[in-house]
Amino acid sequence: MLQVNHERVAKLLQGLAAFTDSEEGVTRLAYSPLDKKAQSWLLEQVQNLHLQIRTDAVGNVFLRRDGKQPQLPPVASGSHLDTVIHGGAYDGMCGVVGALEAL
C-alpha cells in the first residue's frame, strides 16, 4: 500500500507556493520567469527519484519512471505549475505533487 510522506508533500507544496508575484494567493503566470524558476526548483527536488526527464518544445515537462512489469501499459498523470492571478495555493500544484508522491 502507498505510504504518503506528509513532510515531503508539505515541503513541495510550500516550496512551490513561494514562487509568486503577489502577497494575496499565488500568482505565477504561464511561461513567466517565475514559472520557469518554479519548474527548475521542482526538478532539483526530484533529482533523487532517478526519473527520466524530458521537456517538449513548448516547455511541458515529462517525468517517467519505468515500471516493474514493462509489458503493462503506463500510468499517466498531468497537471500544471502556473496559476491565475491570486490563485489558490494548491491549484495545479496538488496534482503535480500528488503524482510525484505516487511514484
Report the location of each language-model feature.
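N-terminal capping segment at the start of a domain
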Residues: Q3-P33
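A non-catalytic alpha/beta surface segment that caps or lines the substrate-entry region
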Residues: S22-D66
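Glycine-/small-residue-rich active-site loops that bind phosphorylated ligands and cofactors
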Residues: Q69, V84, D91
